């Protein structure tokens, strides 16, 4: 017999159910968000061959592993995109709101080796109230890349600890 089990905090499910019931609707079934996300855009070929779908949330990163058109594993690591903003704020000594704006408007996870000699700085409009700092885009992207790499390593370790798949031969969608 096939068994699929996903654990969640009971209070979170109860809260969601109460909100939906208050709208005079009812819950027929629950589905793990990353699983639903994967099914919404993955091709059948990906599902057959094996794929990992990774969803960076604000406070956590969730992932789903699909093999042979079946959900094999879901998991969560306790770091998300908000941790990137916190890292930027701490390292650059700026407010968290400014760090979030910089991350969204100017941040990149890939560090372009071709522009290391050409130093570009963040635009002034990202800094409110005359709080401008001369910060290089390379510095910002290095901070972002470091945290994203750490999060992806945590996902990798969780998947490998269950000996689910040979990750090197599978596609990964972020």
Predicted features, each with a name:
Residues 82, 86, 138, 142, ...:
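Feature representing long, continuous alpha-helical segments
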Residues 1-52, 70-72, 95-97, 107-141, ...:
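Nucleotide/phosphate-binding catalytic cleft detector across ATP-hydrolyzing
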Residues 93, 104, 153-156, 160, ...:
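Hydrophobic alpha-helix feature that most strongly marks membrane-spanning transmembrane helices
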Residues 162-174:
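Short glycine-rich phosphate-binding loop at a beta-alpha junction
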Residues 73-75, 85, 97, 152, ...:
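Extended hydrophobic-aromatic, low-complexity segments
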């Amino acid at each position: 017999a096939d068994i699929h089990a996903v654990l969640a905090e009971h209070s979170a499910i109860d809260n969601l159910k109460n909100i939906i019931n208050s709208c005079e609707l009812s819950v027929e079934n629950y589905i793990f968000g990353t699983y639903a996300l994967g099914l919404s855009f993955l091709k059948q070929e990906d599902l057959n061959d094996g794929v990992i779908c990774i969803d960076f949330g604000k406070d956590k990163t969730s992932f789903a592993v699909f093999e042979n058109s079946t959900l094999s594993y879901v998991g969560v690591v306790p770091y998300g995109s908000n941790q990137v903003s916190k890292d930027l704020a701490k390292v650059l000594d700026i407010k968290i709101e400014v760090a979030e704006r910089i991350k969204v408007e100017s941040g990149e996870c890939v560090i372009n080796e071709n522009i290391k000699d050409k130093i570009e700085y963040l635009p002034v409009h990202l800094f409110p109230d005359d709080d401008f700092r001369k910060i290089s885009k390379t510095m910002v992207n290095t901070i972002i890349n470091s945290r994203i790499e750490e999060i992806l390593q945590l996902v990798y370790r969780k998947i490998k600890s269950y000996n689910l798949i040979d990750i090197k031969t599978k596609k990964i969608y972020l």
